[in-house]
Swiss-Prot record:
GO terms for biological process, alphabetical: defense response to virus
Highest taxon of source: Archaea
Organism listed in the record: Thermoproteus tenax (strain ATCC 35583 / DSM 2078 / JCM 9277 / NBRC 100435 / Kra 1)
This protein's record includes keyword Transport: no
Single annotated GO MF: DNA binding
InterPro entries according to UniProt: Csa3, WH-like_DNA-bd_sf, WH_DNA-bd_sf
Protein name per UniProt: CRISPR locus-related putative DNA-binding protein Csa3
Signal peptide residue numbers: none
Classification of source organism: Archaea, Thermoproteota, Thermoprotei, Thermoproteales, Thermoproteaceae
Cited function: CRISPR (clustered regularly interspaced short palindromic repeat) is an adaptive immune system that provides protection against mobile genetic elements (viruses, transposable elements and conjugative plasmids). CRISPR clusters contain spacers, sequences complementary to antecedent mobile elements, and target invading nucleic acids. CRISPR clusters are transcribed and processed into CRISPR RNA (crRNA). A putative DNA-binding protein it may regulate either or both of the Cas protein operons encoded on either side of it.
SUPFAM superfamilies from the UniProt entry: Winged helix' DNA-binding domain
Protein induction: Not significantly induced by ultraviolet light or by NaCl. A monocistronic operon.
Protein encoded by which gene: csa3
Protein family according to the UniProt entry: Belongs to the CRISPR-associated Csa3 family.
Gene3D superfamilies: 3.40.50.11700, Winged helix-like DNA-binding domain superfamily/Winged helix DNA-binding domain (1.10.10.10)
Length: 204
């Protein structure tokens, strides 16, 4: 696995990322170029990380050209991206590249020792292509629910809902949980995004 980690002036967040989310076959430390003197601090952090772990490579992201920077990050083919520090634009571009490539994506918050898994958001592009009926199902599912429960929530017959859930499951938007009574699960992040998309569509 090729893992990319955004890096700023401090190395502790990147160290936490490697401790919590490693190991990986290859580590790419993404650091920013802004044209300012402070850039040398990020470069120094990357060198310290590579020396400390004995592996990895630095990748300079030129934030003065955001469109090119996005394409460069996307082109790295990262399978997992950890947002562990660096300028806000670097973090934003790394997140966007992750969503477009459908990589695993985690954020290392300042207030918690545990990384947050944002990978469900990689289905965002798929949500934009859903029909209103299927989007309504994603927006309605909370926790583990059965087909009949979903049908009741959205006001449709169970046969139609079962077909929609099968399509959503194959697309990776809904998780199908096995058992005699099959149940379905949508990550709360996706449920919220789908509901907000519904609200926005209703206001146009």
């Amino acid at each position: 696995m090729r893992m990319g980690i955004t890096v700023g002036f401090e190395h502790r967040f990147a160290v936490r990322a490697l401790a919590k989310l490693g190991p990986a076959d290859e580590y790419i430390f993404l650091y920013a170029y802004t044209g300012r003197d402070e850039d040398s601090r990020s470069e120094s952090t990357v060198r310290e990380l590579i020396a400390a772990f004995g592996r990895g490579a630095g990748f300079r992201v030129d934030l003065t050209k955001p469109s090119e920077a996005l394409e460069q990050i996307y082109g790295l083919g990262l399978e997992r991206v950890v947002l562990a520090g660096g300028p806000r634009l670097l973090v934003l571009l790394a997140l966007l590249a992750s969503l477009l490539r459908r990589s695993e994506v985690y954020v290392l918050p300042e207030y918690s020792a545990e990384p947050l898994d944002l990978t469900p958001l990689t289905a965002l592009c798929d949500l934009c292509r859903l029909s209103p009926a299927k989007l309504g199902i994603v927006a309605s599912v909370s926790g583990r629910v059965g087909i009949d429960d979903v049908a009741q929530l959205v006001g449709r017959d169970s046969t139609t809902v079962a077909r929609y859930l099968k399509d959503l499951s194959e697309a990776g938007i809904v998780k199908s949980l096995g058992g005699r009574r099959r149940e379905y699960f949508v990550d709360p992040l996706l449920t919220t995004v789908a509901r907000l998309m519904q609200n926005r569509a209703g206001s146009l």
